């Protein structure tokens, strides 16, 4: 079995409220490294890579994201009934594709072990690595299951990869893979900014049959229609891969990202979408949190948001996956 290394011990540390009894526990007191016979749970995987952001001409710094999210997560109150494992950060040498391949291998192994991965990025090129690992697992465990990809993001990330992969190309790469493999490409993006995507990207999304809602249609007054659109998409698929780019949030909420949003989708709306997914009882096989950039954060504001979302996702994903 692959040997796993937990993130630095100093990261998993925090307050201990022993005087308040056995239920006054926090994440740092519960998370462990996985063992060969570990019961099914949630597997945290770090993707400390921002090469894709650099290639995409973005502001780098997201490589430091995973450990900073864990620092914020460590001190949160523990509210889960299933285990969470720290599988450490991926280890790789070389180019972006090498990092994505290393991630794919780690995601696949955790899914095969019955765990539900949550990958902490890192640039949104994380999605190509996550998808490859998930697709390999499904091809062995449940090849007939229809996979849906839900991306909460200000960007389509459908840029051409003709000159190489980047943080802007993962879903174009997935679309090409699906076409070659004869698989349906069920991709939805909620939170799209009209001012952060060229017309060429809107045209490509339309050509590929992408379901999307603009950020201006994801506000409080549009909550009903937005949730109906989400439900319609979820009804088309058997299982879900959920990926959250933190730049979907307003810059005031998430300043520490590679490309901050001028408008954005409120955190309350993002969490309403998570609630809707949970009510749907659709299997969420894995999730990502992408583009956290500590270099530009303010008072760890974005780290706290990312940690909150990670904790929510851990509750949403905490069901055994199908083993091959």
UniProtKB/Swiss-Prot annotation:
Short name of one Pfam family: Arginase
Alphabetical UniProt keywords: Histidine metabolism, Hydrolase, Manganese, Metal-binding
Sites where the protein binds Mn(2+) 1: 124, 153, 157, 245
Cross-referenced InterPro entries: HutG (IPR005923), Ureohydrolase (IPR006035), Ureohydrolase_dom_sf (IPR023696), Ureohydrolase_Mn_BS (IPR020855)
Enzyme Commission number: 3.5.3.8
Family statement drawn from the similarity comment of this UniProt entry: Belongs to the arginase family.
Role noted for this protein: Catalyzes the conversion of N-formimidoyl-L-glutamate to L-glutamate and formamide.
Protein name listed in UniProt: Formimidoylglutamase
Organism placement in taxonomy: Bacteria, Pseudomonadati, Pseudomonadota, Gammaproteobacteria, Oceanospirillales
Gene that this polypeptide is encoded by: hutG
């Amino acid at each position: 079995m692959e040997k796993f290394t937990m993130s630095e011990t100093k990261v998993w540390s925090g307050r201990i409220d022993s005087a308040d009894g056995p239920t006054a526990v926090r994440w740092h007191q519960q998370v462990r490294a996985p063992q060969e016979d570990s019961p099914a749970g949630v597997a945290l995987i770090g993707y400390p890579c921002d090469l894709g952001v650099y290639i995409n001409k973005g502001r780098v710094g997201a490589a430091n994201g995973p450990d900073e999210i864990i620092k914020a997560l460590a001190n949160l109150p523990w509210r889960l009934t299933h285990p969470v494992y720290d599988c450490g950060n991926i280890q790789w040498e070389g180019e972006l594709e090498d990092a994505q391949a290393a991630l794919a291998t780690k995601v696949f192994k955790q899914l095969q072990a019955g765990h539900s991965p949550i990958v902490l990025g890192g640039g949104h090129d994380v999605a190509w690595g996550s998808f490859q690992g998930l697709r390999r697992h499904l091809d062995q465990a449940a090849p007939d299951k229809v996979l849906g990809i839900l991306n909460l993001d200000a960007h389509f990330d459908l840029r051409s990869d003709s000159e190489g992969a980047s943080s802007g190309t993962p879903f174009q790469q997935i679309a090409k893979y699906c076409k070659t493999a004869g698989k349906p490409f069920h991709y939805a993006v909620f939170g799209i900014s009209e001012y952060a995507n060229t017309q060429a990207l809107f045209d490509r999304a339309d050509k590929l049959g992408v379901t999307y809602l603009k950020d201006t249609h994801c506000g409080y007054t549009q909550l009903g229609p937005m949730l109906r659109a989400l439900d319609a998409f979820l009804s088309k698929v058997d299982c879900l891969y959920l990926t959250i780019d933190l730049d979907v949030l307003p810059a005031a909420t998430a300043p520490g990202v590679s490309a901050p949003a001028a408008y954005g989708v409120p955190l309350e709306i993002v969490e309403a979408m998570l609630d809707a997914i949970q009510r749907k009882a659709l299997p969420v096989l894995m999730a990502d949190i992408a583009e956290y950039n500590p270099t530009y954060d303010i008072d760890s504001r974005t780290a706290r948001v990312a940690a909150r979302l990670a904790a929510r996702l851990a509750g949403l994903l905490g069901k055994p996956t199908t083993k091959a």
